[in-house]
């Protein structure tokens, strides 16, 4: 467990029950994000999402190299979740953030910021060199948070729709 602020947000491993609730919620959420970003059609997005998660987490919460945390608020109650995987980058191993979710009634209270600050301690404890992540282009709130935390863009994909020829 790592503390990160006087307001105290900590991370602890998710329980099996917390993992099951998280997985059931994240599959349709990820599908909706892929549809909103124009990558998938709505018709089969949930099934594609389910398949991606099955591929990424073949042993569920016990998949080697993956770490699933509950984000715990100052009152000791879970306020969200955080999933990282150990990943190889040129010359170093890093924590790749696959998901961070704060429960709707706990958003805009600094929990995500403090969870990432706590994650830095976990990353150091795991012997990893840094933190990498992906953020959807339409998620401007997350982009602002990551900039505040000192993340720098490494790749940017852009898209422009072109109307059909007349």
Could you tell me what each predicted segment is?
Residues 129, 152:
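Short acidic/polar active-site loop segments enriched in Thr and Asp
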Residues 9, 13-103, 116, 122, ...:
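Acetyl-CoA-dependent GNAT
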Residues 94, 130-132:
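Structural preference for beta-strand elements that scaffold enzyme active sites
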Residues 1-8, 166:
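Actinobacteria-biased recognition of intrinsically disordered, low-complexity terminal regions
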């Amino acid at each position: 467990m790592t503390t990160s602020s006087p307001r105290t947000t900590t991370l602890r491993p998710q329980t099996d029950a917390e993992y099951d609730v998280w997985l059931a919620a994240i599959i349709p959420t990820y599908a909706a994000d892929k549809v909103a970003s124009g990558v998938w059609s709505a018709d089969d997005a949930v099934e594609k999402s389910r398949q991606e998660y099955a591929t990424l987490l073949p042993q569920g919460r016990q998949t080697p190299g993956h770490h699933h945390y509950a984000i715990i608020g100052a009152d000791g109650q879970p306020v969200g979740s955080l999933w990282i995987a150990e990943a190889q980058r040129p010359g170093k191993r890093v924590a790749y953030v696959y998901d961070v979710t704060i429960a709707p009634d706990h958003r805009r209270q600094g929990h995500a910021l403090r969870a990432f600050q706590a994650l830095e301690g976990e990353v150091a404890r795991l012997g990893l060199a840094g933190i990498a992540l992906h953020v959807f282009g339409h998620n401007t709130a997350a982009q602002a948070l990551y900039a505040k935390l000192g993340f720098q863009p490494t790749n940017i994909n852009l898209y422009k729709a072109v109307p059909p020829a007349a």
